Amino acid sequence: MDLNHLNLRVRDAVACREFYERHFRFRLAFEAEGGFFVRNDAGFLLALVPAVRHQPLPTGFHIGFRLDRPDDVTALRSSLDRDGVGTGPLEDSRPHEDYVTFRCWDPDGTEIEVFWDGS
């Protein structure tokens, strides 16, 4: 069984679509419900649908992207910083020594963890 999709209700579907396409290699799959459905190379579908009334996500909710190498994590963080995207500090050795991570936020404020875990 595979996790297939995530539906995010967002304030600005266009800005979120551009963010995920530019920084996380998603591509438009189709448009519906006034929003965008974008897919990555692994086949995961992210639905970015306009919210009628915005409700903040629960504390601790985040999306995680695992990258292939620790250098990929630092390169993406640098790219996001250059583009003015807010990022948290680069951390390593948490929860074990084969772990490198940072946090950032999409245009709607959804927290994203980018990491490499040695697997």
Task: Please name every model-derived segment.
Residues M1-A15, I63, G118-S119:
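N-terminal beta-strand motif that seeds the catalytic metal site of vicinal oxygen chelate
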Residues M1-D2, P56-G60, H96:
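Short glycine-enriched loop/turn motifs at secondary-structure junctions
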Residues H5-N7, F37, H62-G64, T101-R103:
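Short aromatic/hydrophobic contact patches that present stacked aromatics
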Residues D12-R27:
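Amphipathic alpha-helical segments
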Residues A15, P70-A75:
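Short, conserved charged micro-motifs
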Residues R27-T59, E111-W116:
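Conserved short beta-strand elements that form part of the metal-binding/catalytic scaffold
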Residues R77, R82-S119:
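Vicinal oxygen chelate
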